[in-house]
Every structure is written in C-alpha cells, then in structure tokens.
Amino acid sequence: MGVDLESVSEATSGAIGSLLSTTILYPLDTCKSKFQAEVRARGQQKYRYLSDVMWEAISKGQVFSLYQGLGTKNFQSFISQFIYFYSYSYFKRVHSERTGSKSIGTKANLLIAAAAGACTSVLIQPLDTASSRMQTSEFGESKGLWKTLTEGSWADAFDGLGISLLLTSNPAIQYTVFDQLKQHLLKQKNAKAENGSSPVVLSAFMAFVLGAVSKSVATVLTYPAIRCKVMIQAADESKENETKKPRRRTRKTIPGVVYAIWRKEGMLGFFKGLQAQILKTVLSSALLLMIKEKITATTWILILAIRRTLFLTNTKGKLRSP
C-alpha cells in the first residue's frame, strides 16, 4: 500500500501551522493556564486578574518563564496536528472511496472530525498532560519532560483523557452553530435580493466573523470541561516549607475538581478565565488556518520533489545492478 501523499501534505502543513501559532501565543497560553488552574476562596486568590500572572513573572525577573514548557508544547502541537490532519484526510479519503463521491455531507464530516480528534487525544495525552504541568509550575521551577511524566504512574500521564475525548464534540458544536447562522443570514439576504438575481453567498469577511462567533459559542458551552481538565493536569502547588525530598503527585479526579470549584468559587468559578480562553482559541485557529493555507502549496511541491528524487535514485540503482 503506497503512501497517501495528499494526507502527508495536509498533515505536515497543519503541523507547521500549529507549531508557529503555538509559539506566537505561548505567553498568553501560559498566563491563561496558570489563571485557570488556581482555585481559591474569594479574597485568597493569588491571581485576581489574568494580567496578575504576567506581573508576577515580571516582578520575579522570570519573564522567560512564560515560555516554560514551550518545547514540549510545540512537540505536542506538531505531533497532534500531524495525527489529526492525517487521520482526517485518511478517513475522508476512505469515505469518498466507499461512497464513490468526493462530496461529504455535514454529518459525515462531523463524524470524521470526531474520529480524528479521538485518535489524536488518545495518542498525545501524555504530552498534553506534561505540557500542562510544566506551564502551571511555579515560575522558574518547571521540570523536564521525562521528569514531569515520571513523577507519578503512567496512569497519571493520561490524566484528563476522558475530558479530552468529551471535548472532541467542540468542532461539532462549532460547525452546527456556524451552519445555522449561515443559513439564517443567507435566508435574510436572499429574501431582500431581487427575483431572478444570482444566489447570495457569504463574503470572506462574514465567513470569518461567523467562524469566530461559532467557535466562541462552542468554547462557552464546553468551557467548564476545559477548566476542569486544566485543573486535573496542573502541577501541584509548591509549599514554602516543603523539603527537597520528592513528593508523589496528588491524584485529581473530575468529581474532586468540580466540588472544589463549586465550594470555593461558586457557579461562576466554572467560567473563570473564559475571556482569555476565547481570545486564545480564536487567535490560534485564525493563525493556524492562515499559516496552513500559505504553506500547503509549498509543502506539496517539496513532497513531490522528494518523491521524484527518490524515484530517480531507485531507478538508477536498478539500471546499474547486473
């Protein structure tokens, strides 16, 4: 069975786009994660606002610590996007071959996206857990990837996997909201258009706006799960009188973090850091798609050039052999 070059091209360009967008937005992501991970009663918070995380790093002279765990996060982003885009492209091709049609309906597309997301979540969960722990560690105290993962059992490396699988529904919610808004808007515009005129289509700007709105709605609806996941994966708080003897990591559960949020912060606590999450998610998605579109053609040309070079090399080798 030959290599699916189109899937490889899509996966590579998506992975590179994810790597660049992750690096650009990483300080914001670190501040967001540390802000989300803290759960304390009113008046005892270390971070009252998202900006407090940034000021803490500046006051401690640990500005570069806003990038702690960047290597692991980039590795995770590259691998996860490669797996996702390859899986998505592969499942899409298999569906087209079985149905005999290149067009894919909305429901089938959502199922394919969910399947690709589930495969990605299972395979990269240890990296996701490690990067979250490294980000939420005290500034200047972040550990390496291997040491972070070996603090607990291998089961601990898959902390939050259930929520990660649940969050694969996020794209389904986004596309459903986008489709409903699009149909409503086009219906209004077509009603105002004169009879006999060509059908109205969405402009690029309106498509971007509807995409941002639908992504924001999906983020709001799934945000309590997002915050619980960050808290489960977050590093344990360091104590000032803590000895240098290594401590076994405290295991966190979904019921445990839900109860902690409810008891200390109330209902609104489930939405703490929502604004930062929406800002980061929308910017990240926009950057990822923009960069991916710009480099897809170049990636495809490079892959074809490499394939052609390997083919010529193999051909020459066969001709020279007796």
Curated annotation (Swiss-Prot):
What biological-process GO terms show up in the record? ADP transport; ATP transport; fatty acid beta-oxidation; indolebutyric acid metabolic process; seedling development
Q: Which GO terms describe its cellular component?
A: peroxisomal membrane; peroxisome
Q: Which Pfam families match?
A: Mito_carr
Q: Where does the UniProt annotation place the signal sequence? A: none
Does the entry feature the keyword Transmembrane, yes or no? yes
Q: Which domain of life is it from?
A: Eukaryota
InterPro entries documented for this protein: Mitochondrial_sb/sol_carrier (IPR018108), Mt_carrier_dom_sf (IPR023395), Peroxisomal_Ade_carrier (IPR045900)
How would you summarize where this protein is expressed among tissues?
Answer: Expressed in stamens, pollen grains, seeds, leaves, cotyledons, roots, stems, flowers, hypocotyls and siliques.
Q: List the keywords (alphabetical).
A: Antiport, Membrane, Peroxisome, Repeat, Transmembrane, Transmembrane helix, Transport
Q: Per the database entry, which stretches of residues form a coiled coil?
A: none
| Location(s), subcellular | Peroxisome membrane
Membrane topology type: Multi-pass membrane protein
Could you tell me which residues the Solcar repeats occupy? Answer: 5-94, 104-184, 202-298
Transmembrane regions listed in the UniProt entry = 8-28, 104-124, 158-178, 201-221, 254-274, 286-306
Gene3D superfamilies given for it?
Mitochondrial carrier domain
Q: Does the keyword Transcription apply?
A: no
Question: GO molecular-function annotation terms?
Answer: ADP transmembrane transporter activity; antiporter activity; ATP transmembrane transporter activity
Family of this protein: Belongs to the mitochondrial carrier (TC 2.A.29) family.
The record's function comment reads: Peroxisomal adenine nucleotide transporter catalyzing the counterexchange of ATP with AMP. ATP is needed by reactions that generate acyl-CoA for peroxisomal fatty acid beta-oxidation during postgerminative growth. Required for the beta-oxidation reactions involved in auxin biosynthesis and for the conversion of seed-reserved triacylglycerols into sucrose that is necessary for growth before the onset of photosynthesis.
Q: What is this protein called?
A: Peroxisomal adenine nucleotide carrier 1
Organism encoding this protein = Arabidopsis thaliana
Gene behind this protein? PNC1
